[in-house]
Amino acid sequence: MSIRSLVLAVLCTIAFPAAAHAAVPNSRDGEVKLMCRAINTFRAQNGVAPMKMSSPLVSAATWMSSDMATKNYFNHSDSLGRAWNTRLGAFGYWGSAMGENIAAGAVDAATTINQWKNSAPHRAAMLNPSYLAMGVGRGYSASSAYGSYWVADFGSSLDRVSDC
């Protein structure tokens, strides 16, 4: 781990202590893995290369989905007032091309990806050939307006990646 990554990890833990601990279980969510695979299947069906899962993007997406669920809002700007691209940088991800899809209400990956496929901007983000990496997160709160909240963050840099 580089000094820069270590410093960023410490700063994120200090700045977001509850979120850092709450985010980890969702990153292993079976529906999240299904979403990653579904996005790559959709890309393959449209002649676009698959993306890898990026650890910083997974962290950012998981934090954001949990933040929306626990604080009961639905927006690309988070509860701290940061735009999505600023948030990705705060989680250690920088790329020349980046994007974000969000959804709320659907509990499963299949319903959510179908919503995104039927929305031109969300469809374009999933099929953008400049995006090589993604991170998917799903948050849930029974007391929130929508229950389930999904975030898929995309980027052009391959930073700490693995297969879905």
Question: Which residues does each predicted region cover?
Answer:
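A short alpha-helix/helix-coil micro-patch that ends at or immediately precedes a cysteine
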Residues: A23-K71
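Bacterial N-terminal signal peptides
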Residues: L8-A15
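Short, surface-exposed glycine/acidic/tryptophan-bearing loops
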Residues: S59-V107, M126-N128
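Disulfide-stabilized extracellular recognition modules
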Residues: A104-C164
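Bacterial N-terminal signal peptides that target proteins for export
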Residues: M1-V7
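Sec/Tat signal peptide C-region and signal peptidase I cleavage site
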Residues: F16-A22
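Extracytoplasmic
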Residues: G30, V48, A83, A97, ...
